[in-house]
Amino acid sequence: MSGGLDILSLKEDDITKMLVATTHLGSENVNFQMEQYVFKRRADGVNIINLGKTWEKLVLAARAIVAIENASDVFVISSRPIGQRAVLKFAKYTDTTPIAGRFTPGAFTNQIQPAFREPRLLVVTDPNTDHQPIMEASYVNIPVIAFTNTDSPLRYIDIAIPCNNKSPHSIGLMWWLLAREVLRLRGTISRTTEWPVVVDLFFYRDPEEAEKEEAAAAKELLPPPKIEEAVDHPVEETTNWADEVAAETVGGVEDWNEDTVKTSWGSDGQF
């Protein structure tokens, strides 16, 4: 929580980013435990999330993450593809442990399997899709931080950060803001300077679109084809070969009519 400190309060630039990323847009349904985070309901049925409370809970979550002595004991999880890139980037900059993709059942409870882990804190992208690690964390008393929408269940969740967790841009921005706040509380970066890591790195990218963009970028880097100038070669004058070479006679006979034609194969003219 900001505790009324101006240095921890929500800045106008961050509010603009949230509005552009549609972080304030919830779903049409509301869980009774999420009603406290709903600002109002639009005419089309979409619930608007109070961004002031979103920021307060995000600061509280960052303080909980910083309180863990060993950063690798904090596990960040995302089963949905739109949050996997953000989870990997968050783990890269905060030295936490990512689990992107399918979660192995029993990783927190079954001690005999090779994938067994003992985290001290979980941060999940969506309580609906990440219900398996949340359930296992409740068995072994692991606190859970979750990005929750207006219709998300809050069972076994200790810190809920209300936001739009269905939009790729919104979930990427929330992970970026959480990573920046963690680094600020650790003293790694200053609050007076801008974090050089752009938020675009946390956004989900479609593999097909990424391949097209990379191919287009590689095509632009290729040097332009060299165009060779045409060289004028002297053209030799053609000569009439018929004038220089006389026509050869066949069989030494100039006139075919003068050649004697045999009428029989015998010497006496008989066949």
Curated annotation (Swiss-Prot):
**This protein's UniProt keywords:** Cytoplasm, Developmental protein, Nucleus, Ribonucleoprotein, Ribosomal protein
Q: Which PROSITE patterns match?
A: RIBOSOMAL_S2_1, RIBOSOMAL_S2_2
- A single Gene Ontology molecular function, please? ribosome binding
**Where do the record's region annotations for Disordered lie?**
249-271
Sorted alphabetically, which InterPro entries does this protein's record hold?
Answer: Ribosomal_uS2, Ribosomal_uS2_C, Ribosomal_uS2_CS, Ribosomal_uS2_euk, Ribosomal_uS2_euk/arc, Ribosomal_uS2_flav_dom_sf
Q: Where in the cell is it found?
A: Cytoplasm; Nucleus
Please provide the Gene Ontology terms (biological process) for this protein: ribosomal small subunit assembly; translation
**Which portions of the chain have biased composition (kind: Polar residues)?**
262-271
Asked if the keyword Amino-acid biosynthesis belongs to this entry, the reply reads no
Which is a Gene Ontology cellular component entry for this protein? nucleus
Spell out the CDD domains in the cross-references. Answer: RPS2
Q: What function does this protein fulfil? A: Required for the assembly and/or stability of the 40S ribosomal subunit. Required for the processing of the 20S rRNA-precursor to mature 18S rRNA in a late step of the maturation of 40S ribosomal subunits. Required during oogenesis and imaginal development.
Q: Which family does it belong to?
A: Belongs to the universal ribosomal protein uS2 family.
Note the subunit structure. Answer: Component of the small ribosomal subunit. Mature ribosomes consist of a small (40S) and a large (60S) subunit. The 40S subunit contains about 33 different proteins and 1 molecule of RNA (18S). The 60S subunit contains about 49 different proteins and 3 molecules of RNA (28S, 5.8S and 5S). Interacts with oho23B/rpS21.
Q: Give the protein's recorded name.
A: Small ribosomal subunit protein uS2
Organism of provenance: Drosophila mojavensis
